[in-house]
């Protein structure tokens, strides 16, 4: 936030002249009551407490010097026992326009990450069926976080973990093989746990067409052929759906790689070297309770088979070994109990838990005509992500998935998202940008063109609504910084809703092109250009287009 940075610089200079240094507990914040000014600080109270003097006296000295030495403040007042309330001058806020337009598409970016190498793993759905809308939410959040962290100075790599070695994959092969038998006229009994979706039938038909003699295979060979064919078909479908959704993974890491390279056994040996494993009843255990887990965890069972937890440890061990400074996992909410144990394992290897973030994605309920659509992959009764995308569009789907905090339940209302009204959040925001573009085109046709914003007289930007818009535009840098720091892309969607609301309200009061004064038209056009640039930058981070026409 430019205003906060500027105020802090001025305060540091002022208190230095008074013989003081910036105290650790001093804060600058936005007052809850806007009548108290743009910013407030407790610096006088903290200084007074540290050196044992009257806070009101020192607050008055700071206020006097601030106003003497800078024209950027229209008022600096002392409130209560020694709080300082600061209101910036219109001239200060007007410069926000120049700042934004000079920065352009980089406005809001920063070097928070300092080129730190980050690996974000997301979606990682079992290749046992098409992606559904729950996966879509994780995809939107993961991809947006990657964009956001790159925008704030991180070196980001994105990864999809292919669960291709577990029981679910075995069931996929068995399900397809059984369908092949059924399609070939053989009577079969269908176990409850097998996959029953129509996509299984389509895969079986495709495999029969490609390999007509497959029905002559033994069950073992038929199941294996079905598994490999089915997994490739489904995985290719997943990749295509993600591409359509504007989601890209740079790395596709196969679980089978861990087995083929003996990475699991190597990881377990490394863990044993930490002294945090033990043998009990023929099984190998990890002392995860040392790091706060509620119980110790089995790594290798008494029958010598490995647990899923052992595979997960090996996978995450490779993440750090590949040179990443920070690991981010985006998982379904059903993984809540998994967090403590996997973090404990990484701590056992000496990794700081602050370098490992796990974001949980809560469920999505699809509403159609006000009724919730039930979803179950096993039964084949689920809403495919691609169907939702085809119905509402990529932009609408992404924006809606990002509208709420990731660990909050989300109702996805199909009818609302398809509406071209102000009740539809994504339409509300995109229309704000399109409206600005339309005004600028009309202005150009009327002979109003801004070639250099520094030549535009911005002193006309003085109304309460205009200054509120500028305050909100100045806040964008803070929104991006905080969204990246807290891994919270919903901060951006909420900000966009607020900014779009201010823009629509402003235009209703001040039809930009209807003023008789050229300088007013040009200054307001510059303001709209700045608003448009911020909306564009924010939507770009979300992976949502900023349409010039609607």
UniProtKB/Swiss-Prot annotation:
Keyword Cytoplasm listed: yes
Keywords (A to Z) from UniProt: Aminoacyl-tRNA synthetase, ATP-binding, Cytoplasm, Ligase, Nucleotide-binding, Protein biosynthesis
A biological process term (GO) from this entry: arginyl-tRNA aminoacylation
EC number of this enzyme: 6.1.1.19
Locus of motif 'HIGH' region: 125-135
Quaternary structure note: Monomer.
Family the entry assigns: Belongs to the class-I aminoacyl-tRNA synthetase family.
Any one Gene Ontology cellular component term annotated for this protein: cytoplasm
Subcellular location(s) of the protein: Cytoplasm
InterPro entries per record: aa-tRNA-synth_I_CS, Arg-tRNA-ligase, Arg-tRNA-synth_N, Arg-tRNA-synth_N_sf, ArgRS_core, DALR_anticod-bd, Rossmann-like_a/b/a_fold, tRNAsynth_Ia_anticodon-bd
Organism: Lawsonia intracellularis (strain PHE/MN1-00)
CDD domains in the record: ArgRS_core
Gene name for this UniProt entry: argS
Pfam families: Arg_tRNA_synt_N (PF03485), DALR_1 (PF05746), tRNA-synt_1d (PF00750)
Name recorded for this polypeptide: Arginine--tRNA ligase
Catalytic activity, as annotated: tRNA(Arg) + L-arginine + ATP = L-arginyl-tRNA(Arg) + AMP + diphosphate
Uppermost EC category: ligase
Major subcellular site: cytoplasm
